[in-house]
Amino acid sequence: AMINRPMSTGDALYLDRAALAELDIGAATVRIDERTSLRILELDDQRAQIELTAGTINLSVRNVYEGQYYEIDTPTLAFVVEQPGIYRVDISPSGDSTMISVVDGSGIVYGQDNASYSVSNGRSYRFNDTSLTDYQVFSLPERDEFDQWCLERAQRYDESESRRYVSEDVIGYSDLDEYGTWGSASSYGSIWYPSGVAVGWAPYRNGRWAWIDP
């Protein structure tokens, strides 16, 4: 996949060894570990539903607005976010169990025959079947390299100067720090100035347009 390519309903993504990726979804960010396979089942202004078939993701939800819905489906369960927070979802190498780690926040796990289980912050939950009857509850494990990368990426967002000028729900707002600076004009207000721009530059002359179905 190309950097900054919009992803939409029906798109699939596989990360090979040593690869990492980040998806911005409105008020949430999905960070993806190596050897992970996922598909976007539904994505619009109200609903984000992702099918995780292998590997590990970190879901960081900054806000859950009225009517919004974040769901992660795995081979054994469906996890739905209830509150803003940080959630990690791991699928076992065999694919027959799913671990939900709730760093912060809360959610509901759904299984077969309307089974459900509430999960809350500070715990990891491993579900070994689709009925949610075979499960274990643990303390959160020590951070690994993927957790550390997710933390560093989150800090980059939190410390972004552009948060002072742009809503954090604007996808890619933190990139403005890297590619320009902020100033102000008495007749307009805050203005972002791109850096490294050649003389005579004008918008829309470079690059290309593409239509991505929602």
Regions found by a protein language model. Name each.
Residues 65-67, 113-214:
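Low-complexity segments
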Residues 1-109, 113-123, 153, 159-161:
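Flexible, surface-exposed loop/linker segments and immediately adjacent secondary-structure boundaries
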